[in-house]
């Protein structure tokens, strides 16, 4: 029975690529919750790194495979205890997939479209969380300008590094790909 279990070199490369994407997501989750959590900040705010990884992987792998990764990663993010994670499941899946579809249809796979999609994803996610807090927890409106917009801008500082890592990881097994 075990003699029929054979994994081709192409399948090994795909397994390696998705394992590295998952490890990059776990690294972002670790940085966001442990290193920058608990009161420690970067330039006065806590960066939101998980959506940066999700967007970069989604744009690199396309709408179908990247969308599956985005859904699983945002679900994992919600299950790990993210505040208002249920909204993040929707936002961090729909916006990167829509960005991947637009980028594949009209734009080249480059850094600037990825940066803009990351900006839109972070802004929509932070705005959704702000609106929930504003309506249900009676949060002051100035919180949006003092905390959430700087959080989006600080999170964008990490996007070039994540983009380069995802681009390098995405080249694993690329010459064997027929798509």
Short names for language-model regions:
Residues 1-179:
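Terminal, non-globular segments
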């Amino acid at each position: 029975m075990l003699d029929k279990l054979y994994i081709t070199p192409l399948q090994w490369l795909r397994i390696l690529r998705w394992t590295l994407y998952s490890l990059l997501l776990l690294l972002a989750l670790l940085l966001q919750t442990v290193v920058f959590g608990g009161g420690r900040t970067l330039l006065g705010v806590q960066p939101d790194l998980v959506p940066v990884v999700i967007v970069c992987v989604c744009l690199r792998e396309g709408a179908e495979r990247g969308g599956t990764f985005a859904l699983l990663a945002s679900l994992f993010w919600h299950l790990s205890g993210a505040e208002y994670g249920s909204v993040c499941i929707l936002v961090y899946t729909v916006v990167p997939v829509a960005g991947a579809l637009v980028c594949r249809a009209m734009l080249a796979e480059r850094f600037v479209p990825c940066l803009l999609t990351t900006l839109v994803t972070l802004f929509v996610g932070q705005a959704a969380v702000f609106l929930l807090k504003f309506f249900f927890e009676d949060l002051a409106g100035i919180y949006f300008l003092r905390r959430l917009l700087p959080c989006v801008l600080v999170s964008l500082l990490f996007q070039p590094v994540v983009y380069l890592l995802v681009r390098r990881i995405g080249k694993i097994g690329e010459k064997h790909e027929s798509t």
